[in-house]
């Protein structure tokens, strides 16, 4: 759940991602129609999508309709939370994995980026200042990740504008990239999907440089942050206390689900022995442990891999992560949540650099100075 005082009344409101079935009561009357392929065959969704999504075809192309629960926007009305997502214009039922509040247009009102996994579009909701939001992603973003996961915001070039990064699963070397490449040929390929999303969705990280014009430049390749394997959490912070925002990235997965060879073996088993054999096949596989990443911001929109140097390139299946000054010495420490193992707690031993600690206090009801930048 992501918190922000989006209506600027002095108390925290919250946006809750919900990405699982069964549907809520409001979806009980949803109807789906059969979509046929070019030879009259039904269009079959990938197995992971069949539980909670349908597909429709319009004159402008294909569109996915998700049938999971809606996300929730809770407005804090003096200690009582009221769900206002529909009236606020942020009513989505896609497979959300992260939500980030940030004032991207510097108008003083918190805006919201929702990163959605699988085929669901990402959304950049501009806060209109009247309790409602407008999705400006199609005109503000050149493209987004395909399988968006973790995300974070920071001013990576110290120009006073907040930039943003959303993660995906692009392989960090040639072998990983080819082994996880999707099938783009034949009737069961994903090639149809590349034609209809606006903005387009590509399977790699996205780094959005804020131009201050209402549009972003996507510069992941330029920064060196485009491909970090099966990425989950992204956490920006000045880890070396040099005045520039560095970034920690957690990686790994319970199984190597995107390995093309393994997927082909699974499909052959299912065809010959049934779906139970396919599930048993994956149960016998080891988790996909990958190294976590740490990148130092070198300035000029360049980042260098310093994970080994900083002792953060631990090979594990790491999902969530959080930065904070745990020991009160003025630098940022790190906590990482690991699948099937104990969490990692990393103390920052930085002895150089400058620190500044602020204790902000607001006026009136906003005692905690919510919304201060």
Where are the language model's segments positioned?
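Acidic, glycine/proline-rich Ca2+-coordinating loop motifs
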Residues: 1-373
């Amino acid at each position: 759940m992501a918190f922000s005082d989006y209506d600027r009344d002095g108390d925290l409101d919250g946006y809750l991602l919900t990405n699982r079935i069964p549907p809520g009561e409001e979806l009980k009357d949803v109807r789906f129609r059969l979509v046929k392929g070019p030879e009259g065959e039904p269009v079959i969704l990938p197995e992971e999508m069949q539980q909670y999504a349908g597909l429709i075809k319009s004159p402008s192309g294909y569109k996915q309709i998700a049938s999971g629960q809606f996300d929730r926007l809770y407005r804090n009305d003096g200690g009582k939370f009221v769900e206002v997502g529909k009236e606020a214009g942020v009513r989505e039922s896609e497979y959300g994995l992260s939500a980030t509040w940030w004032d991207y247009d510097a108008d003083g009102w918190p805006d919201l980026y929702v990163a959605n996994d699988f085929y669901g579009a990402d959304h950049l909701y501009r806060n209109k200042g009247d309790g409602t939001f407008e999705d400006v992603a199609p005109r503000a973003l050149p493209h987004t990740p395909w399988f968006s996961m973790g995300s974070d915001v920071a001013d990576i070039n110290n120009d006073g504008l907040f930039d943003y990064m959303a993660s995906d699963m692009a392989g960090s070397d040639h072998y990983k990239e080819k082994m996880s490449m999707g099938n783009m040929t034949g009737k069961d390929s994903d090639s149809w999907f590349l034609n209809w999303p606006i903005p387009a969705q590509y399977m790699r990280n996205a780094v959005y440089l804020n131009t201050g014009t209402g549009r972003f430049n996507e510069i992941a390749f330029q920064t060196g942050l485009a491909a970090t394997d099966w990425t989950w959490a992204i956490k920006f912070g000045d880890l070396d206390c040099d005045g520039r925002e560095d970034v920690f990235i957690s990686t790994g997965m319970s199984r190597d689900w995107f390995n093309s060879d393994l997927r082909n073996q699974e499909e052959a088993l299912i065809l010959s022995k049934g779906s139970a054999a396919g599930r048993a096949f994956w149960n016998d596989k080891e988790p996909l442990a990958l190294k976590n990443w740490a990148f130092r911001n070198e300035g000029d929109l360049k980042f260098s891999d310093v994970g080994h140097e900083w002792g953060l390139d631990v090979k594990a299946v790491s999902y969530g992560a959080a930065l904070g000054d745990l020991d009160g010495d003025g630098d940022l420490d790190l906590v990482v949540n690991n699948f099937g193992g104990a969490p990692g707690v990393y103390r920052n031993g930085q002895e150089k650099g400058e620190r500044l600690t602020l204790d902000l206090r607001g006026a009136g009801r906003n005692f905690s100075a919510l919304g201060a930048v």
